[in-house]
Regions:
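Segments of small-molecule ligand-sensing domains
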Residues: 524-647
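An alpha-beta-alpha
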Residues: 404-444, 532-554
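Hydrophobic alpha-helical segments within soluble ligand-binding/sensing domains
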Residues: 394-416, 507-526
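Short, charged/polar connector segments at secondary-structure boundaries
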Residues: 1-113, 119-120, 130, 175-188, ...
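Periplasmic-binding protein-like
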Residues: 353-361, 380-382, 469-478, 500-508
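Flexible loop/hinge segments that line or gate small-molecule binding clefts
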Residues: 372-395
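Extracytoplasmic "Venus flytrap"
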Residues: 296-316, 321, 332-336, 426-430
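A short, basic-hydrophobic beta/loop patch
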Residues: 102-117, 123-155
């Protein structure tokens, strides 16, 4: 056993010497960090005795005091020769580790910002590190830093809250919000305290996950295992980690890398606000991109078209696509029925689908999962502001239409009060409310917008009528074919006899959108993007995807104003948010010298000062709206997990 201990020491010594030389050559500190030298006492808010824990070996990076710092390299491998007193003690500990006795006494250490600094037990730690022990028993005292605006300190406070629930080390995020999202992704309520069984189950599976991740190329390992796990849990159940062979698990993790990068990148989403130009672009020609001659296109529906005006509108768009592109495309529709979206997607792909249009936001998870398994298929989902690289999103700038209808409503109201029915509190909805309010104020400086929500129980139009509101903006009409028949949508006036007088109706033309997207694929535009950015098509009225039908019954002046606004928005000379804007709390949101960026517009979570209403709490929504808001909602990251979602 002595010979084995000596051999182990010599191996560890070489590792220590190599680390030391490499660190010195790169101008880095070659010894373990010393906590007392990097942390002034004035930065400490207090201490917390955590008791005896199993701590991650890789997280032990230093010592509490300087001591004899030349005995160990920064990787805790020895630097002194085998004849030294230090080496003799090290080897005796090694013999104990190899015997039935083992190293039983815990080290004593201080934890600061998730890293451990040893006060007693340097050699024990060194021996266990040399054997690649994943954890070390330790008596831990936490050093609590003073709260500050430093992002690292704020993130650590998030970790401390997570630790108070889970009592877990080794789960690391580098950006705010990760711990709360993990708690929710595992199916736990925000303040759920983990049981011993849950902690043990998670640790066992997470260890398998980490080992699979370590097999990725080194350049991919700048992201933490917890960051990869968050993306995994968006697509696959936690237990599946144990059920998949390690090589397959590693392959899946490599395919998730673009989404992991995208989630931490502030500019992860590329909002394409205009359709691609006609014909192959310069970059396509330079790269000699392969341009398809024929495409098999699958449309995925949540129900048959005759059961939903939304699905029927997309089916109308599908027909336009077929009529315009003829033999260049083969188009099939796939209806969910009672099946899982994943099943339908796999069937569509097995049938030869090159392009998949998923027409409902609830299909996002199934599309993302399919995209990791079928990287050569082009997936598009009818949603917006989603940071997923494998699936492109498509939607429209409805706020442009609402600005016009707001101006019409302001001109046509007989009072200063106008009703507005919003659908769901999702990205883009607030911008539409605000654009409508700004349009109304343009023609009626005293206009006030009474906001109600279709996602709440009851009839929002009836509630507005009961308040004496007679001019109301309802939701957009979803297809050109419905403009003449769905007067209850769009903006209308309620007459004395209860009948509706249509004023101006925003409407979608999905056929125009599908035609332009498919033509962009034929032109080679699909490939000319960075793999770490999520592409979201967010087109406006100039693209033809959205328009406003002005009623023939409008006065000539209002009709002319509506036309001028339409033309101005389409040519860019009119920008609804290029004006002085105050919110409901009196905060100046824009001084009028510039317009807001697309990202600022999409992510608005405030209302203009002439809007009376607020974003409804998730708990108040009708159940059928819950799934959409979980996926697209402004506050989706803060929502409680669904009941019964525990994955451990």
């Amino acid at each position: 056993m002595k010979a084995e201990a000596l051999a182990q020491y010599n191996t560890a010594l070489k590792a220590g010497q190599k680390y030391y030389k490499t660190a010195v050559s790169r101008g880095k500190y070659p010894y373990p960090l010393v906590l007392d030298e990097i942390l002034p006492e004035s930065s400490i808010a207090g201490y917390d005795n955590l008791g005896i824990l199993e701590i991650p070996t890789d997280s032990v990076i230093g010592t509490r005091f300087a001591g004899r710092k030349d005995a160990l390299a920064g990787n805790f491998m020895p630097l002194l020769g085998p004849e030294s007193e230090f080496a003799q003690k090290w080897m005796r500990l090694c013999e104990a580790h190899l015997s039935d006795e083992g190293i039983r006494d815990p080290i004593q250490c201080f934890e600061y910002l998730g890293r451990f600094y040893i006060q007693e037990g340097n050699k024990r730690c060194s021996v266990l590190k040399s054997y690649l022990a994943p954890t070390i028993p330790a008596s831990v005292t936490r050093v609590i830093p003073r709260w500050s605006g430093d992002p690292e300190i704020q993130l650590y406070y998030e970790f401390m809250h997570f630790y108070s629930l889970s009592r877990l080390y080794g789960v690391e995020f580098r950006h705010p919000g990760g711990y709360a999202r993990l708690q929710a992704a595992l199916g736990f309520a925000p303040e759920h305290i983990w049981s011993t069984e849950e902690r043990q189950s998670f640790s066992a599976v997470f260890s398998v996950f980490q080992k699979a991740l370590e097999k990725l190329p080194e350049e991919h390992l700048s992201h933490t295992a917890a960051e990869f796990l968050l993306v995994w849990l968006q697509l696959f159940p936690f237990h599946e980690i144990q059920e998949v062979p390690t090589n397959e698990l590693t392959a899946r993790l490599e395919k998730l890398l673009p989404d992991v990068i995208a989630l931490e990148n502030e500019r992860a989403i590329e909002l394409r606000t205009e359709p691609a130009g006609k014909g192959p672009g310069v970059l396509t020609k330079i790269l000699n991109a392969v341009i398809p001659e024929h495409l098999d296109i699958a449309f995925l529906y949540s129900c048959p078209p005759e059961e939903s005006t939304w699905v029927r509108a997309h089916d109308d768009g599908r027909k336009v696509l077929e009529d315009r592109l003829g033999s260049r495309v083969t188009v099939k529709t796939w209806v969910r029925g009672g099946k899982d979206y994943g099943e339908i997607l796999e069937a569509a792909i097995a049938d030869g689908g090159d392009v998949v249009f998923a027409t409902d936001a609830g299909m996002i998870s199934a599309c993302r999962k399919a995209a990791t398994l079928h990287p050569n298929v082009r997936f598009l989902n009818c949603a917006v502001f989603q940071p997923y690289t494998g699936v492109r999103m498509y939607n429209g700038r409805t706020y442009e239409c609402k600005f016009i209808t707001g101006a019409v409503a302001g001109a046509m109201t007989r009072s200063d009060t106008i009703g507005y029915v919003a659908n769901n509190p999702i990205f883009g909805t607030t911008a539409s409310v605000n654009a409508f309010a700004l349009g109304a104020r343009m023609t009626n400086p005293n206009a006030r917008i009474v906001l109600d929500w279709a996602c709440l129980p009851g009839d929002p139009v009836q509630r507005l009528l009961e308040q004496g509101v007679t001019v109301i903006s309802n939701r957009e009409i979803v297809s050109p074919s419905m403009v003449q028949t769905h007067f209850e949508m769009g903006t209308f006036r309620v007459l004395l006899d209860g009948s509706l007088l249509p004023l101006a109706s925003p409407f979608w033309d999905w056929g125009e959108l599908y035609d332009k997207i498919v033509r962009s694929i034929f032109s080679g535009d699909w490939k000319t993007v960075s793999g770490s950015q999520a592409i979201n098509y967010w087109w406006g009225m100039a693209s033809g995807v959205l328009d406003v039908k002005l009623s023939d019954l409008l006065p000539d002046g209002v009709q002319s104003l509506g036309q001028i606004l339409k033309e101005g928005i389409c040519d860019g000379s009119i920008q609804p948010f290029r004006t002085r804007i105050f919110d409901q709390h009196g905060e100046l949101r824009n001084d009028g010298s510039h317009t807001l960026s697309p990202e600022e517009i999409l992510s608005m979570d405030w209302f203009c000062d002439n809007v009376d209403g607020c974003i409804p709490d998730f708990s108040l929504l009708r159940p059928e709206h819950g799934e959409t808001v979980r996926v697209l909602g402004l506050y989706r990251d803060s929502l409680l997990p669904e009941a019964g979602g525990d994955q451990l």
